[in-house]
Amino acid sequence: MSFERFFSAEEILIWRKQELSKGGRAVDLDWLLDIGGGLGWSTLQELKIFQSSFHKLDLSLEELSLIWMRHLSDQIPLQHLVGKCPWRDFELKVNSSALIPRQETEILIDIALKKVDAGLMKYGRWADLGTGSGALAVALARALPLWEGHAADCCNDALALAESNINTLTENANVSLHLGDWWEPLKPWWGNFDLVVANPPYIPKTHLSELDPVVRDHEPILALSGGDDGMDSCRKVIKGAMKGLRSGGWLLLEHNFDQSEQALNLMVDSGFLEVDFENDLEGVRRFGLALRP
């Protein structure tokens, strides 16, 4: 089916009002116009001023309406319906095999690059445990092109998604992918990692039913559930890091909003030094960092 993809600002604004009358959040519909339709945020703000202007969309308004209605009726994430998600300075392919990358996780990369810069390390070896879509791995490969990278996940489909994103979004990246549980597939390199990042599942299983249906029913439970207290995977990552990291290597971990004390205590008890935390975009303790002695 072929649709016309040139629309006036007035047509787009009328369409937007009609679609919002069906339900949903304005911020989500604007996201769809931006990422699905190719109408940038700044252009969207200008429509009210320049209503006689014309704009070419990547998808027609009819096609965007079909996506919006499916999002509302089936509560499927818009990212899954359009098959992509912007993250940092690139756009990831996404599907139901892996968690949709969250904006707050970008901070983990910022922390990592600060630690690398502080150590003036041009060469090194990093690992991304539970890589999922490969968001962290792609970001590290792009920022540290001379480093050797390793991305691991226990889900074959997620690993295939990560491989696709790494191949598409990095140029000649030296990244190896491994199938297995956390540190286990990286045994041959234990004691030789300079940097390890992880965003493991950390939702207590008793809280899963409280999640938004868009998340609960369409993102993999394997990437959400952290066991009884939400810390099962965090424990494995932290305890394994003493074997996996070299002396002077950094562990950077994302955890739930109320798990900072537990995570930092685990790091201290495991023998790490310079144990500290960083806040997320809302000012909440979300990241634990520690140096292997």
Curated annotation (Swiss-Prot):
One of its GO terms (biological process) is methylation. Its EC number is 2.1.1.297. GO terms for molecular function: nucleic acid binding; protein-(glutamine-N5) methyltransferase activity; protein-glutamine N-methyltransferase activity. Signal peptide: none annotated. The keyword S-adenosyl-L-methionine applies. The keyword S-adenosyl-L-methionine applies. S-adenosyl-L-methionine binds at G130, T131, G132, S133, G134, D153, W182, N199. It comes from the Bacteria. It is an enzyme of class 2 (transferase). It catalyses: L-glutaminyl-[peptide chain release factor] + S-adenosyl-L-methionine = N(5)-methyl-L-glutaminyl-[peptide chain release factor] + S-adenosyl-L-homocysteine + H(+). Substrate binds at N199, P200, P201, Y202. Keywords: Methyltransferase, S-adenosyl-L-methionine, Transferase. Belongs to the protein N5-glutamine methyltransferase family. PrmC subfamily. Methylates the class 1 translation termination release factors RF1/PrfA and RF2/PrfB on the glutamine residue of the universally conserved GGQ motif. This is Release factor glutamine methyltransferase. It comes from Prochlorococcus marinus (strain SARG / CCMP1375 / SS120). The lineage of its organism: Bacteria, Bacillati, Cyanobacteriota, Cyanophyceae, Synechococcales. The gene is prmC.
